[in-house]
Amino acid sequence: MHQSLTQQRSSDMSLPDSMGAFNRRKRNSIYVTVTLLIVSVLILTVGLAATTRTQNVTVGGYYPGVILGFGSFLGIIGSNLIENKRQMLVASIVFISFGVIAAFCCAIVDGVFAARHIDLKPLYANRCHYVPKTSQKEAEEVITSSSKITPSTRALRNLTQAVKEVNCPQLSRGLCTPRIRGNTCFCCDLYNCGNRVEITGGYYEYIDVSSCQDIIHLYHLLWSATILNIVGLFLGIITAAVLGGFKDMNPTRPALNCSVENAHPTVSYYARPQVASYNTYYHSPPHLPPYSAYDFQHSGVFPSSPPSGLSDEQEPQSPSPSPSYMWSSSAPPRYSPPYYPPFEKPPPYSP
């Protein structure tokens, strides 16, 4: 009984601790998923800004932002659920895992592209020229128009005038004259004459830009997307680990508290009568004689003479019943079992 009460008291003390651990895990899960969602939005924003900066440079750094953002959104919803918490958190962990892989790949691709294929030295030296859209129209009209002057000669002359503003003396030859589009930032120092492969390692033209300063912005956006993908990589791993430890935790149900509260009156109710009945039975005199109603109904079969060996003086003082209630030799066996309390003399037996 003592042990059961101690166990009930220890279980009552452990309920606030379990609820505190559950709330602490839930709070940590929400914190990391919200942080991952913010990083995912930044990755998506920077990646879209970088990939829409130019037409011929494609950036894939925004794909991890979409996957990680969706996984973190599922994690926030699953952390606030009770019934379907495990299913939502498992789906969130799966999406976050794919987002971590995508962030790792995109960080490598964008970092290598920004380091090897974008050279800012000609831009800082003002050796790149921006060709507006009007120059492209004039060049196309010159090339496609038919006149007495041969198209090649007129095209070379107009393109040479346009290229002279770029300060590219090697482009004055006919074989090395490029076709420059409108809204293009062209860097002649990075262009290999007559070779389509850029051995110098950089893009020599950037199409559909507003100015050559957009190339510098593109370079910074690529490195920003690379850094954010690395941050999303490690934060996604941490978030998946936190959600994996939280998905199997359940809050303490109210039914457990009710069962613990009902255990106290049950123990006190059954414990006290047992002790009272034990003391009353063994330490108090009996309220009824150890004879049944059958003995009193058939009292005529008993002899009226007192038992042998007892005098008249001892008869009133004896705690035994009256001699008229004694059994005779021809009487049937007794109905009640011959049990006598301790410290009391049993009645004599007469054959």
Swiss-Prot record:
What is the topology of this protein in the membrane according to its UniProt annotation?
A: Multi-pass membrane protein
Q: Where in the cell is it found?
A: Membrane
Its domain of life?
A: Eukaryota
Region (Disordered): which ranges? Answer: 302-331
Annotated GO CC locations:
membrane
**Mind listing the UniProt keywords for this protein, alphabetically?**
Membrane, Transmembrane, Transmembrane helix
Quick one: signal sequence residues?
none
Task: List where the protein spans the membrane.
Answer: 30-50, 57-77, 89-109, 226-246
InterPro entries the record matches: TMEM255 (IPR028014)
**GO BP annotations, alphabetical order:** response to bacterium
Against PANTHER family, the record matches this protein to: TRANSMEMBRANE PROTEIN 255A, TRANSMEMBRANE PROTEIN 255B-LIKE
Query: To which protein family does this belong?
Result: Belongs to the TMEM255 family.
Could you tell me what this protein is called?
A: Transmembrane protein 255A
Q: Which organism is it from?
A: Rattus norvegicus
